[in-house]
UniProtKB/Swiss-Prot annotation:
May positively regulate ERK1/2 signaling and AKT1 activation leading to HIF1A up-regulation with an increased expression of glycolysis genes and enhanced glycolysis. CDD domains: PRX_like2. GO terms for biological process: positive regulation of ERK1 and ERK2 cascade; positive regulation of glycolytic process. It comes from the Eukaryota. It holds the Pfam family AhpC-TSA_2. Residues 1-24 are annotated as: Disordered. The lineage of its organism: Eukaryota, Metazoa, Chordata, Craniata, Vertebrata. This is Peroxiredoxin-like 2C. It comes from Mus musculus.
Amino acid sequence: MAAPVTRQVSGCAGRVPSPAGSVTERGQPLAAAVAELPVLDASGRRVTFGALFRERRAVVVFVRHFLCYVCKEYVEDLAKIPKSVLREADVTLIVIGQSSYHHIEPFCKLTGYSHEIYVDPEREIYKRLGMKRGEEISSSGQSPHIKSNLLSGSLQSLWRAVTGPLFDFQGDPAQQGGTLILGPGNNIHFVHRDRNRLDHKPINSVLQLVGVQPVNFMSRPTVIHV
């Protein structure tokens, strides 16, 4: 196995190193300046990013924006992961968006998501971690988590924007997301940066990296024992 990358993730977009598709015990260091950046919870309370994974390993999913139909359907499947299997593996699941914190509660009601969720409204953490802006044209394959096509999904997003209490895009529509496995402490074990809206990491492949049994998302969520 190749030696893990150990350069600090310090905040230079496009230069943040990515480890291979395996999880190392120690990981690579996350710069303290990034860990100290704030996120906001649903009540607007500021929490340092590093506090979210200080004590245990966390799967952190950065979404594009809360109006994105792809993000909505992906988070709907994240919501199906039983809390009991995460507790058993001592893993925290966290979603981070980049809207105002006022949009957190409606988004959770819409998706049924009840795990941890925060926002980075200035996108500082997105930038420091090298998350892309704009969509790279590439074939990302068929996602197991997305049910809507481009037309129907876009119309749903537009309808939610128009009928919502605040007419906005609930974040920068050009921003892409990504998935990281972090902690305990300022250690990064896995990084995936989305190239476009459909390039998110399949959930079960991430769960496997943190020792969580795969989940059947096709019907009522159940753990697949292997």
